[in-house]
Amino acid sequence: MTGYCFTSGEELIAICKKEGLTISEVMLRRQQELSDDTAENILKELKTTLHAMKRSVEEGLTEELESVSGLSGGDAMRLNDRAEKNALSGTLAAKAAAASMAVVEVNAAMGRIVAAPTAGASGILPGVLFTCAGERGWNDEKLLSGLLTAGAIGSIIAANASISGAEHGCQAETGSAAAMAVLRSIIVVRMSSMLRNLTMIPAISSPSRMGRMEASRANPLIS
């Protein structure tokens, strides 16, 4: 096992404490070990992934897309409109839901999305990340840190459980994506308590229609 590899939350925390690094920094170094590539190249590729996520959110919120079958489309725009009108769940949560729906509709319309960790759950992570970015003024550097952190959480799930809906149902996909997104949002405050007993959570893959399971397990950040 190399210096920055981990398969559980406990191992991840131990590395963070030993090296004095954040989760995103550990994940970046892990990726360097796995890919034998430079941090600069890894971040460049990850930035391409980030921009693909952003484009899918923007496309779904500004265009009334329709699925190939015609059964769905336009819900993201309607939900986003309602988010500004005293939504029961609160404006921020409603905006995140709308942004997540936007990506799902781009996927259904055969657009370009990022499987995070799968195409079926592709909206959750970007929906949360970009909504929080708009609320908190996060720049690309902060968002890249978020993707690395989410990838670290995802790699734990991939190592211990499954991100496959066909194998374990929709919760394997959406539950994993939600854990990646939520833990990224609160990781600074409660990292130790949230991760100490964590033994499962998925991987970010490059822009594609479907995540490649085996590649994601071996290389949880960019496949």
Segments from the language model and where they lie:
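Beta-strand segments within the central parallel beta-sheet cores of soluble alpha/beta enzyme folds
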Residues: N139-A152, R190, R196, A203
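Acidic-glycine-rich active-site phosphate/pyrophosphate-binding loop
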Residues: G90-N107, K142-S162
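Alpha-helical support elements that line or immediately flank enzyme active sites
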Residues: P126-W138, V182, I186-I187
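Conserved phosphate/anionic-ligand binding catalytic regions in large, soluble enzymes, centered on
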Residues: M110-V128, E173-A177
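Intrinsic low-complexity, disordered N-terminal segments enriched in polar/charged/small residues
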Residues: S192-T199, S208-G211, P220
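Generic N-terminal targeting/processing segments that precede catalytic cores or assembly contacts
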Residues: M1-G111, E135
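A structural signal for small-residue-enriched, beta-sheet-centric alpha/beta enzyme cores
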Residues: G165-E173, A177-A178, V182-I186, R196, ...
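Active-site-adjacent structural elements in folded domains
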Residues: M110-I113, I163-G169
